[in-house]
């Protein structure tokens, strides 16, 4: 392949452009995954307590992949500009490894969406909220995290339980075991608060008088951010994989035509 051929120069330009896009996508993927693992909504304790926080694992892999894609895109551009077979061979080998990691990250993130069900968070809430009799320190840590997260959610987002206040009445729970039903039909955080973060009317809240307790459940406030992040990591990753596939294919064709 003659390096001074105008068609070759044009093809090189296309491949360089393709790698520039790959590098930019890598930076964007890293930024997205950093935003996700920074846990802006402070929901990680709920996932940690389920012993299945694979979505965070997928995001960490995405961060690694994003950085690698940026670095490898630079390597690919150098190899294309110099028409160096050895540099491009190293580029292919490393890119295929990174490609495999990103496939794993995307599949993990996409499949985790079905994991975020109401029953998952309901079971966890009933077992761990205000549970002060854990079998070991690890469970105590998880129970404390779940309790603090639920307290914050119910206070901050004006909701109660997973599906609503009836969760605390309908099912057996650690909270029900520790508290009298008449005094605590549901946690105080379910009550409408005044400016001092105190129940507006405790008795009315306990009796379930409309306007003095929160009727809405918290499930949408939990699953919404998690699902959005899961789909973001998965589908943006898949889009990057599709683009990278064609860039790799074109670069492999170019590599096969480089003269020894």
From Swiss-Prot:
Its main location: membrane. It is a multi-pass membrane protein. Residues 39-60, 108-229 are extracellular. One of its GO terms (cellular component) is apical plasma membrane urothelial plaque. Keywords: Membrane, Transmembrane, Transmembrane helix. Residues 1-12, 82-86, 251-260 are cytoplasmic. It is found in: Membrane. It comes from Neovison vison. InterPro entries: Tetraspanin/Peripherin, Tetraspanin_EC2_sf. CDD domains: uroplakin_I_like_LEL (cd03156). Heterodimer with uroplakin-3A (UPK3A) or uroplakin-3B (UPK3B). The keyword RNA-binding does not apply. This is Uroplakin-1b. Belongs to the tetraspanin (TM4SF) family.
């Amino acid at each position: 392949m003659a390096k001074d051929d105008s068609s070759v120069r044009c093809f090189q330009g296309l491949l360089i452009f393709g790698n520039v896009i790959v590098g930019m996508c890598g930076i964007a993927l890293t930024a997205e995954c950093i935003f996700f693992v920074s846990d802006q909504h402070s929901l990680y304790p709920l996932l940690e307590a389920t012993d299945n926080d694979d979505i965070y694992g997928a995001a960490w892999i995405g961060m690694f992949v994003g950085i690698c894609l940026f670095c490898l895109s630079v390597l690919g551009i150098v190899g294309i500009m110099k028409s160096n077979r050895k540099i491009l061979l190293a580029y292919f080998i490393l890119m295929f490894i990174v490609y495999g990691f990103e496939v794993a990250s995307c599949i993990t993130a996409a499949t985790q969406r079905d994991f975020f069900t109401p029953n998952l968070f309901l079971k966890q809430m009933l077992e761990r909220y205000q549970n002060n009799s854990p079998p070991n320190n690890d469970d105590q840590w998880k129970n404390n995290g779940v309790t603090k997260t639920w307290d914050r959610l119910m206070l901050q987002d004006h909701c109660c339980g997973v599906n609503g206040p009836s969760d605390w009445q309908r099912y057996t729970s650690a909270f029900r075991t520790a508290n009298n039903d008449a005094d605590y039909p549901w946690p105080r955080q379910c009550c409408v608060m005044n400016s001092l973060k105190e129940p507006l009317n405790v008795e009315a809240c306990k009796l379930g008088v409309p306007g003095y307790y929160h009727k809405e459940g918290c499930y949408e406030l939990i699953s919404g951010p998690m699902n959005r992040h899961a789909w973001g990591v998965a589908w943006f990753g898949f889009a990057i994989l599709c683009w990278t596939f064609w860039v790799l294919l074109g670069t492999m064709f170019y590599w096969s035509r480089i003269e020894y």
